[in-house]
Structure formats: C-alpha cells, structure tokens
A protein has these predicted regions:
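Short gly/ser-rich loop at a beta-strand->alpha-helix junction or flexible surface loop bordering the NTP-binding
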Residues: 13-55
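Generic structural signal for residues positioned in beta-strands
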Residues: 42-43, 60, 79
C-alpha cells in the first residue's frame, strides 16, 4: 500500500517544525469561490520552497514569511484566510464573505472576525452587510 500523501506531508511538517497552509487556490476551490486547482498539491510553508514527489504525487511547498497567512493553519478558518489572501482585496467582496460564512459554523466565523487579519480582510469580514 502506498503511503497516504497527506499523512506524509504532516510528518514532514512536524519533523521540520514548519507551519503549512493549503495554497489559496485550493482553499478558494474548497469554498466554492473558484474552479481553479493547482496541478500539484501546493502548500504555503514557513520552511524553504521545495518540490517533492510522495508516492507518485508532486507536492510543492512555497515559502512565505507572511505570518498572518498561517493563522489557524490546518483549519477551516485557516482555509478562509488562505482563500482571501489568494483572491486579494480586489476580489474579496460581500458575495465572497457570504460564501465563506456559509462554509464556516458560527463559532468559526466569530474566530475569523476576531483574528488579527490584514486590515483589508478585517474590513471585508466585519462589514455590516455580512450580518444579513
């Protein structure tokens, strides 16, 4: 049996004491915000940029020093942050926030609202229009 790629990635992350966050394109796809998907499993990392092949699957790690990108890494709240980071302030609008809100439970959305997000994300998330 080939190893589970996601489990191997977790072991590598733990061994190297690095944080991983799913790439924003994957996060945006999970949230139903885009149909685009990277050709390789792609993660942001606090470690070095590199590519590996694990059980025939190409995995790319892209270094980022943006600590806010790793807030709640490995959680659905972290996915929402990665998706917004990927989309950028020009594309994150009320519809995007409503889609994110529909994928998170109330506690997770509160966690997102109360986290130290970049100012443009914070404004989008706490906009009064989002409480409809």
């Amino acid at each position: 049996l080939p190893p589970n790629v996601n489990e191997v990635i977790k072991v590598i992350s733990k061994k190297n004491k690095e944080k991983l966050q799913v790439h924003g394109a994957v996060a945006a796809n999970w949230l139903g915000l885009t149909t685009q998907m990277p050709m390789k499993k792609t993660y942001y990392t606090t470690g070095i940029t590199r590519e590996l092949e694990i059980a025939g699957t190409k995995v790319k790690f892209i270094h980022s020093s943006n600590e806010k990108l790793f807030l709640f890494h490995g959680t659905e709240v972290g996915l929402a942050i990665a998706a917004m980071h990927y989309l950028g302030k020009e594309l994150v609008n009320e519809q995007v926030i409503q889609k994110i809100k529909s994928r998170l439970n109330e506690q997770q959305f509160e966690q997102l609202k109360n986290s130290p997000l970049p100012s443009w994300m914070k404004r989008a998330v706490i906009s009064e229009n989002n409480y409809a």
